[in-house]
């Protein structure tokens, strides 16, 4: 049996921009993608802590060091600049492997700076 497990998350990211007219996605600073092990074009869930909204989209790379978390396309209606969000990815694995699996968790602080990564 395969279980769907959390692969990685960016916890308490701050939305820096929302662009309704840009083709869908969430732009994430390449440093943050690397820290979490999230790949460009990987499916992500975005959980808006500020409003409770949840949506699925895909990640694209924003310039390294920019601290950008930018929600694009239709999903931009579900966030506003300065909202706090969690970005989560998942993977599937056998139940036996899942018992000993540890996801990557990147905790962010003000300015989308990495506070802790594990």
UniProtKB/Swiss-Prot annotation:
Catalytic reactions on record: L-aspartate + H(+) = beta-alanine + CO2
Pfam families in the cross-refs: Asp_decarbox
EC numbers on record: 4.1.1.11
Active site location: 25, 58
Top-level EC class as recorded in UniProt: lyase
GO molecular function ontology, one term from the record: aspartate 1-decarboxylase activity
S-adenosyl-L-methionine found in the keyword field: no
Annotated GO biological process: alanine biosynthetic process; pantothenate biosynthetic process
Compartments reported by the entry: Cytoplasm
InterPro entries, per database record: Asp_de-COase-like_dom_sf, Asp_decarbox
Main location: cytoplasm
CDD domains: Asp_decarbox (cd06919)
Top-level taxon: Bacteria
Residues holding substrate: 57, 73-75
GO terms under cellular component: cytosol
Function: Catalyzes the pyruvoyl-dependent decarboxylation of aspartate to produce beta-alanine.
Subunit structure: Heterooctamer of four alpha and four beta subunits.
UniProt similarity note: Belongs to the PanD family.
Name of the molecule in the record: Aspartate 1-decarboxylase
This protein's encoding gene: panD
């Amino acid at each position: 049996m395969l279980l769907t497990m959390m692969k990685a998350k960016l916890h308490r990211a701050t939305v820096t921009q929302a662009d309704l007219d840009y083709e869908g996605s969430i732009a994430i600073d390449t440093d943050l993608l690397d820290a979490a092990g999230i790949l460009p074009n990987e499916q992500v869930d975005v959980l808006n802590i500020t409003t409770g909204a949840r949506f699925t989209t895909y990640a694209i790379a924003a310039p390294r060091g920019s601290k950008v978390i930018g929600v694009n396309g239709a999903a931009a209606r579900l966030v506003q600049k300065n909202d706090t969000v969690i970005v989560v990815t998942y993977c599937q694995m056998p139940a036996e492997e899942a018992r000993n699996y540890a996801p990557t968790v990147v905790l962010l602080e003000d300015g989308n700076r990495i506070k802790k990564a594990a």
